[in-house]
From Swiss-Prot:
Pfam families: Ribosomal_S11. It comes from Chloranthus spicatus (Chulantree). PROSITE patterns: RIBOSOMAL_S11. This is Small ribosomal subunit protein uS11c. GO terms for biological process: translation. One of its GO terms (molecular function) is structural constituent of ribosome. Belongs to the universal ribosomal protein uS11 family. Keywords: Chloroplast, Plastid, Ribonucleoprotein, Ribosomal protein, RNA-binding, rRNA-binding.
Length: 138
């Protein structure tokens, strides 16, 4: 009986280095999801595979401070710092949501030194779809 050929990078023989760290990504897509409670920044390659991500919560902000512009700026800086180290030079930015961190995250992305192809607002807007929830009485 023949022995199976060991595959490089398989789980059995143990990886020496992570596959994500070895990739060089010249161009990527930065997704910013800004809600009223938190801001999530995800960096993907052009095929949509996640390379790096960060949020205001993982950046050390808790409670109502997660929704602040400063928290969004910190989260964007943390997510982008890792991909700039991996060699990313150009990026497209997709911004989604009504949160306070939209502009602050974009400001942090612009300051990072990446060349931005375009900035697109992809906030979902209903064409009179579902009935919205009732108004809050505070």
């Amino acid at each position: 009986m023949t022995k199976p050929i060991p595959r490089i990078g398989s789980r059995k023989n143990g990886r020496i280095s992570s596959r994500k760290n070895g990739r060089r990504i010249p161009k990527g897509v930065i997704h910013v999801q800004a809600s009223f409670n938190n801001t999530i920044v995800t960096v993907t390659d052009v095929r949509g595979r996640v390379v790096s991500w960060s949020s205001a919560g993982t950046s050390g902000f808790r409670g109502t401070r997660r929704g602040t512009p400063f928290a969004a700026q910190t989260a964007a800086g943390n997510a982008i710092r890792t991909v700039v180290d991996q060699g990313m030079q150009r990026a497209e930015v997709m911004i989604k949501g009504p949160g306070l961190g939209r502009d602050a995250a974009l400001r942090a992305i612009r300051r990072s030194g990446l060349l931005l192809s375009f900035v697109r607002d992809v906030t979902p807007m209903p064409h009179n779809g579902c009935r919205p929830p009732k108004k809050r009485r505070v």
